[in-house]
A protein has these predicted regions:
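Short amphipathic alpha-helix with an adjacent loop that forms part of the alpha/beta core around
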Residues: 52-60
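Rossmann-fold cofactor-recognition segment
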Residues: 41-51, 68-70
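N-terminal Rossmann NAD(P)H-binding glycine-rich loop of SDR-like oxidoreductase domains
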Residues: 4-24
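NAD(P)-cofactor binding segment of oxidoreductase domains
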Residues: 59-105, 111, 115, 122-130
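Glycine-rich "substrate-gating" loop/helix at the edge of Rossmann-like oxidoreductase active sites
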Residues: 144-153, 173-185
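Conserved beta-loop-beta element that borders a ligand/cofactor-binding pocket
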Residues: 128-150
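Alpha-helical substrate-binding/gating segment
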Residues: 160-170, 177-206
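N-terminal Rossmann-fold cofactor-binding loop
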Residues: 31-35, 48-49
Length: 206
């Protein structure tokens, strides 16, 4: 049985990913501070990713799914603490693309500061850069807005609620802004595919 390490595991995306792979029969470990209820079937590694010590030493994972890396330091600290692993998937963000670039964004689209996302986007770029230098065969995914079960942000659900209740809601400015959403289950299915291909990829998922 393959072992998967999921960083986080208690909120929305990381929790969904952990539960998804438990259901698929993987041995799933979650790395978090144990401040929230844990999902059924996961193995908890209780630690702060910024102060990991030796909790991961001597452990081997077939796949590391890094959902909670927001800076280059986050990536460095995890890599320094890990024992060994075969594949590494970083969940980055579409925020790495400048707002001035034409959509749809492509993998070869230039990355850079986005005035709407600010440091969140530039920090994600830093995380990607660190990972590419240290783990050249890593996978980097750049999803747009993620939605689905267990979402802790009242965002797309607000729009759905308004539609279901026949309530008005207002679009920013002239309503021409384009946003793309990607279901968290499709993100998992996408990871299923790339793990079967075993090549180096840097991909946007929306």
């Amino acid at each position: 049985m393959e072992k998967i390490l999921v960083t986080g595991g208690t909120v929305f995306v990381s929790r969904y990913i952990a539960e998804y792979y438990v259901k698929k029969g993987y041995e799933v470990y979650v790395l978090n501070r144990n401040h929230k209820p844990q999902s059924e079937g996961v193995h908890l590694i209780e630690a702060d990713r910024h102060n990991l010590g030796d909790v991961l030493k001597g452990k081997h994972f077939d796949v590391v799914m890094d959902v909670t890396a927001y800076t280059g330091e986050d990536v460095n600290l995890l890599l320094d603490a890990l024992g060994s692993f075969d594949d590494y998937i970083l969940i980055s963000s579409r925020a790495v693309y400048p707002e001035t670039e034409d959509q749809p964004f492509m993998e070869e689209t230039a990355i850079g500061e986005n005035k709407f996302w600010g440091k969140y986007g530039t920090n994600k770029i830093e995380a990607e850069t660190v990972l590419q230098k240290r783990v050249p065969n890593a996978y980097i995914l750049r999803p747009p807005y993620l939605y689905g079960p267990m979402n802790n942000v009242y965002r797309e659900t607000f729009v759905f609620d308004c539609a279901m209740q026949n309530r008005k809601f207002y679009l920013p400015k002239d309503g021409s802004m384009k946003l793309q959403f990607f279901h968290v289950k499709d993100l998992c299915r996408f990871m299923d595919v790339i793990l079967e291909m075993k090549q180096r990829f840097l991909l946007k998922t929306g």
